[in-house]
């Protein structure tokens, strides 16, 4: 995360996990029943007696904030400058967690519907952090979605899930302290237009599915997968973020709202108004992101309403019938006047780069099934032949261990980086970092 991870009010189309809350209610602990939602209180979060004034430094604090403010360019490739920042910062191990005075605000990153995000540094250990500051309404208090997100994230510990370090509660604000990430997948793709290196797509996709398999095993649905909600470190670690719409799920399904997931990544069953769904909801979004990484552009963009979104999907998958999708005609938004045309098309015909990578089209087709029960699970997708080129050690990693701890696992330079290198007369071997 960094200057590249802005709120959607700052850069249209960007909704990084700190800045894009504001969905409907969502539950927070596995399969906890809806009737217990009122049981969540602010006391479930860590309370602190210190004020939040230190997040708006004045005087000496302001001078320190300016001194340690990162000057990293938009490419976010210079992680060494941040290391210099940490080495020059005098931290105090005696400072407590849960106190606003333990963190120093460096710069504002963005602002969302009810949260403002700052890049900060921990005065406890010198680590860079992201400070998500939520102002509490005098009448309504903390947005309930924030309480749910915090409660959920405190129970999810995985290398491909963004880490919540600390929670600070005062009378005026609630602050989430997250690990600092350098960028998100949307920004990474915009910095490398025309599609990503096939090797990098494979690594990113493996990490995405690994994170999904974990949360689905914990009975949690993300419900808002999109590139902006997938954070990337300077090494290339991909992490699921923005659990503002996430909620616990029952097995196999439960009645929820159909108004979930950004429109471009919303599956046809949700578009048709289905309120009973399970983990296959996230699988559709992951499949859309999978192909988008190859193609360099969204699969079904530019639509403004549900009907147009469905029409774009039907152009590829064909219009569903009771034979291909049992029960589809009973869904609220199903239109009986739709004609059973066009016929389904091969994915590689629509998105040509899929056909250039062995097994990529087969995996994508298993994720983008119209009938939700036909979609592959995240755990099944991880053992698909598409990933056979990756080291077998990846499957033995503990949940909290990164892929990049395995020898030889690293991102390759993207094509635009290689071209820029040759234009400058440099050799590709000089790439010491992932981008």
Swiss-Prot record:
One GO MF term: cyclin-dependent protein serine/threonine kinase activity
Binding sites annotated in the UniProt record for ATP: 109-117, 132
Positions in coiled-coil regions: none
GO cellular component, one term: cytosol
EC number: 2.7.11.22
InterPro entries, sorted: CDK, CDK15_STKc, Kinase-like_dom_sf, Prot_kinase_dom, Protein_kinase_ATP_BS, Ser/Thr_kinase_AS
Broad class of enzyme this protein falls into: transferase
Effect of residue 93 to E: In a renal clear cell carcinoma sample; somatic mutation
Active-site residues (renumbered): 224
Highest taxon above the source species: Eukaryota
Cofactor(s) essential for the protein: Mg(2+)
Keyword annotations: ATP-binding, Kinase, Magnesium, Metal-binding, Nucleotide-binding, Serine/threonine-protein kinase, Transferase
Domain Protein kinase: 103-387
Reaction it catalyzes: L-seryl-[protein] + ATP = O-phospho-L-seryl-[protein] + ADP + H(+); L-threonyl-[protein] + ATP = O-phospho-L-threonyl-[protein] + ADP + H(+)
Keyword Metal-binding: yes
Single GO BP term: regulation of cell cycle phase transition
Purpose of the protein: Serine/threonine-protein kinase that acts like an antiapoptotic protein that counters TRAIL/TNFSF10-induced apoptosis by inducing phosphorylation of BIRC5 at 'Thr-34'.
PANTHER family from the UniProt entry: CELL DIVISION PROTEIN KINASE, CYCLIN-DEPENDENT KINASE 15
Family under the similarity heading: Belongs to the protein kinase superfamily. CMGC Ser/Thr protein kinase family. CDC2/CDKX subfamily.
Protein name as catalogued: Cyclin-dependent kinase 15
Organism: Homo sapiens
Gene giving rise to this polypeptide: CDK15
């Amino acid at each position: 995360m960094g200057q590249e991870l802005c709120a959607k009010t700052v850069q249209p189309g960007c909704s990084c996990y700190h800045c894009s809350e504001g969905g409907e209610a969502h539950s927070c602990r596995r399969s906890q029943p809806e009737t217990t939602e009122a049981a969540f209180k602010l006391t479930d979060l860590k309370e602190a007696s210190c004020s939040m004034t230190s997040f708006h430094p004045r005087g000496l604090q302001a001078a320190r904030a300016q001194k340690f403010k990162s000057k990293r360019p938009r490419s976010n490739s210079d992680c060494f400058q941040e290391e210099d920042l940490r080495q020059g910062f005098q931290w105090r191990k005696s400072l407590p967690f849960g106190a606003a005075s333990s963190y120093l605000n460096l710069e504002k990153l963005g602002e969302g519907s009810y949260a403002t995000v700052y890049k900060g540094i921990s005065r406890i250990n010198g680590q860079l952090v992201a400070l998500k500051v939520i102002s509490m309404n005098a009448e309504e208090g903390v947005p309930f979605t924030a309480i749910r997100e915090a409660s959920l994230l405190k129970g999810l510990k995985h290398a491909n899930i963004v880490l919540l370090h600390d929670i600070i509660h005062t009378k005026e604000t609630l602050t989430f302290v997250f690990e600092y990430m350098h960028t998100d997948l949307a920004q990474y793709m915009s910095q490398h237009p025309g599609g990503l290196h096939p090797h990098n797509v494979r690594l990113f996709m493996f990490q995405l599915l690994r994170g999904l398999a974990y949360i689905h095993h914990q009975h949690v649905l993300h419900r808002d997968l999109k590139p902006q909600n997938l954070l990337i470190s300077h090494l290339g670690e991909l992490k699921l973020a923005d659990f503002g719409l996430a909620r616990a799920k029952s097995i196999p399904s439960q009645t929820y709202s159909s108004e979930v997931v950004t429109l471009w990544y919303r599956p046809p069953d949700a578009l048709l108004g289905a309120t009973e769904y399970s983990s296959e909801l996230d699988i559709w979004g992951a499949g859309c992101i999978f192909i988008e990484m190859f193609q360099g552009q969204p699969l079904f963009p530019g639509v403004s309403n549900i009907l147009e979104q469905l029409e774009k999907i039907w152009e590829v998958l064909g219009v569903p019938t009771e034979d291909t999708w049992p029960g589809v005609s009973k869904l609220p938004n199903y239109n009986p006047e739709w004609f059973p045309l066009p016929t389904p098309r091969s994915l590689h015909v629509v998105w040509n780069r899929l056909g250039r990578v062995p097994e990529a089209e087969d995996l994508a087709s298993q994720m983008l099934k119209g009938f939700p029960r036909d979609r592959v699970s995240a755990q099944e997708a991880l053992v698909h032949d598409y990933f056979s080129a990756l080291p077998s050690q990846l499957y033995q990693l503990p949940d909290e261990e990164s892929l990049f701890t395995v020898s030889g696992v690293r991102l390759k330079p993207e094509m635009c980086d290689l071209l820029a290198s040759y234009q400058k007369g440099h050799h590709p071997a000089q790439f010491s970092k992932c981008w």
